[in-house]
Amino acid sequence: MVPDADHLAVMRPKDRSHGDWSTNIAMQLAKKAGMRPAELGQTLAEALRKVDGIAQVDVAGPGFINIALDSASAAAVVDAVLKAGSSFGSNDHLSGRTLNLEFVSANPTGPIHIGGTRWAAVGDSMARVLEANGAKVVREYYFNDHGTQIDRFSRSLVAAAHGEPVPADGYKGSYIDEIASRVVKEAADEGQDILAMPRVRDEDGAEGDSPQREAFRTRAVPMMFAEIQQSMRDFRVNFDVWFHENSLYESGQVDRAIDELRAKGDIFEKDGATWFRSTTYGDDKDRVIIKSDGHAAYVAADIAYYLNKRRRAKDPCDEAIYMLGADHHGYIGRMMAICAAFGDTPGVNMQILIGQMVNVIKDGQAVRMSKRAGNVVTIDDLVDAVGVDAARYSLARTDYNQSVDIDLDLLASHTNDNPVYYVQYAHARSKNVDRNAAQAGIDRSGADLSLLDTAADNEVLGVLALYPNVVQTAGDQKAPHRVAHYLEQLAGVYHRWYNLERVVPMEPTGRVDLDQDEDRNPQPARAAARLRLNDAVQQVIANGLGLLGVQAPDRM
């Protein structure tokens, strides 16, 4: 008879005079019970009034049940937070599931750009949230070291090393000159004059498939790979797997995957090319996997890579999650067809998340240039401008389905308009309260939490109680921005509480009217209770920031 969770709502009323919690259960059950919602609401309210810890139950409107807890029950969340500590908010409802989360996966042809930086922040935060929900998460970076992008990169390096113009389809930026110089020096240190190696011009006049281009590729790709890895580590993103696309070809996995599809009747030949009959599985058109010139199309590696994720010896995944940029909408149909072709369920065994654009703003104007990378803003540009904490938080706090503006001036400011400062300052402020309380000799042990009975106390308690549900919802929806929004809500009520309710008594003035003022100088029992509440807020902010990969500072 109880409705499912998608339709049953238990929420905090916007108007706190309506109580601590409100539910629509009477409206959901009324038809099955053969009663009017308001009538059923009264029946349920009578039963709820007999429950220990509930101070008041009212039925409002068409059947909403509003519940007010007594102060001791409302404050029970404080003990729950402090007992659980860093694990408060975590749950195990995704335990037993292995999720492969692939994100960033930028081509190894240059520094991570701002779009990839957003995926680094969102992806790692999402992984942390999913782990807090009990899942085993494999963070994976797919290193595209096979195909035309690498050829363009190598041609660009050869041209730079010889002081020649950038090829028509080449890469530019000072990083190309840097890497070209490093390659030449590394080769020279090993006794090789790489610039004297044979060259071949292609039909466009650029460097063709020459021994020199191959030598540059062999040395430069690992350099770029190491640079990307370091950028990720500096951004507090630690991948479990760095997967090389080339390995799919070298190990024969691409050929075996195609053979498996051929045995199912899903491969055919046309116009000298080999095709995947993906329309059988909902794609809008069939896909070429081996081109007429014998070279593999990108989708060939996609097929083998999905199978690898599902069948690998270590941590095969129940669900492969791909985080892709806004220009990859066309990928969805073919990828879901690959999933279905191997007997898996799209949306269950595979999920594709498409992110939107990032705009970097400085002095009210869009920033489009990097000193090192030319016409793109890189991860290092952003971190140099605002730091890792502000960069991660600002990129993770907006739903990845929406474009986001990163205002460098705002993120560098120490004002309440800066969301990461606002949240981190709440944590630092709570730590300062701790230090002042210790200096004042306040004993928090055995605190009577029923003394947390003011409106400001109740507001903080109510928001604290929301955190476990926020974590679960963020995990179910793969939406780490919900954690950031919650932290800003908690920081807001905490700052208001701090300004209204003293924890540490003020210095005595000798004036009875001031020194006996409960607001100015709370009695030891009330001070101890407030200190425990302060501790609970501190813990939850630290937990939430941890899910976003952001530090919780002791001082600011």
Where are these regions (language model features)?
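Non-catalytic interaction-recognition regions
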Residues: M1-A75, L82, S86, H93-M556
